[in-house]
């Protein structure tokens, strides 16, 4: 039966998203201009909550469309300007380049990654040990590489594992073409194993994601905000690591203990083991690959291994912007492994570009936060506190705000405010150094609570793999909860109880030298 034109428009709006979801987005679009007219500050926070809602409902509808509509309206009604949005995008161009080029570069190294991690999967039989290995490897890599790059590697590996089992459970051979997003062809007897395998991969993904936070907070190059805070404070690579150590070492140890505990006790969705049927398929796949590996295939693996070394050295030594190193990986990997047609190149960009567009929308919301000064009351309250209370309050304020906003933005806002206080002689240099540690750890650790706190977590949530593993916003928050509590609380007590005495001991031991005055440069926000 034909439908009316009006119903056709309604049906087309946000596609196959549920009707209640479409109604909610339309309601947001109607309410926001009214709220902005009545109270711009409240309207700004309402927009932040609405954007978080679109992220939470990512499995109902990709957040780009509803979030984009809200962002466009925000610019139109004057909550922010197109110029401010452009400023945010320009300020974060390195992150955007990373997403476009680095994720595509990792795609062309899939064979090597699958080779290495398949060996790891079939040789380590203990799930707890395997989880610990994923967490440790992610932490080590994230201390020197960007967390987004590490998560891109983990997603590539998990997708490869999932595709192998899905293909076999659908009655196909290893060499056959197969669509691993379609469950209709999965044999009934294999469905339970598939669900168990999803739970297994979900837990590994989350352990790896938390690992990026554990490692990323430790070094100057681990996270973008680390670099901003380190530059503002005038710290070298070594000094940064030493100053963070009173907080990062206890947090790292407790994070690894949490990994072991949730796996052993099977809490919060962890503890799922690799089904024997899946292990046998992985072992068969490994033997199939080994038997069929030609000299040309071996040459490709060697080339990819050499490129991986270049990738790690290039990023760890900051030889170029991350995105440009990613572009060099694309050029080297394709030219030296025989990929020379546009169609094959195009596939590599499919995963990253939707998220790149979503991140641009996210920066539009950050522009609203800046223009409407949504964080100013919290910042003023913390700076007005007594010096003895400031460390704990800065840690808490940064942590809470980083759960709802980009932690790079939060860290940048706070370090600039503290730097201004130092230049105005409101605080001394010793207090500034301690506050910088509290800000850095506050933005990095509690932000694991939600996917919008860290770009790497958001990338994982909105990746093509998330719906395959049934990894929703709510499930990510639930699985991150034990880590949020442990990392957040251990970080808080370390800042409150250990940071001051340990830093004093570092001075006395000669590991640190006191700074005199403020560093010369105070860069603009972002």
Curated annotation (Swiss-Prot):
Domain of life per record: Bacteria
Transmembrane domains' residue ranges: 25-45, 52-72, 89-109, 130-164, 204-224, 242-262, 305-325, 350-370, 391-411, 448-468, 479-499, 505-525
Keywords: Antiport, Cell inner membrane, Cell membrane, Ion transport, Membrane, Sodium, Sodium transport, Transmembrane, Transmembrane helix, Transport
Reaction(s) this enzyme catalyzes, per UniProt: 2 Na(+)(in) + 3 H(+)(out) = 2 Na(+)(out) + 3 H(+)(in)
Subcellular location: Cell inner membrane
Signal peptide (from-to): none
Coiled coil spans: none
GO CC entries: plasma membrane
Membrane topology classification: Multi-pass membrane protein
A GO term for molecular function: sodium:proton antiporter activity
Predominant subcellular localization, coarse grouping: membrane
Protein function: Na(+)/H(+) antiporter that extrudes sodium in exchange for external protons.
HAMAP family the UniProt entry points to: NhaB (MF_01599)
Similarity section: Belongs to the NhaB Na(+)/H(+) (TC 2.A.34) antiporter family.
Name of this chain's protein: Na(+)/H(+) antiporter NhaB
Gene behind the chain: nhaB
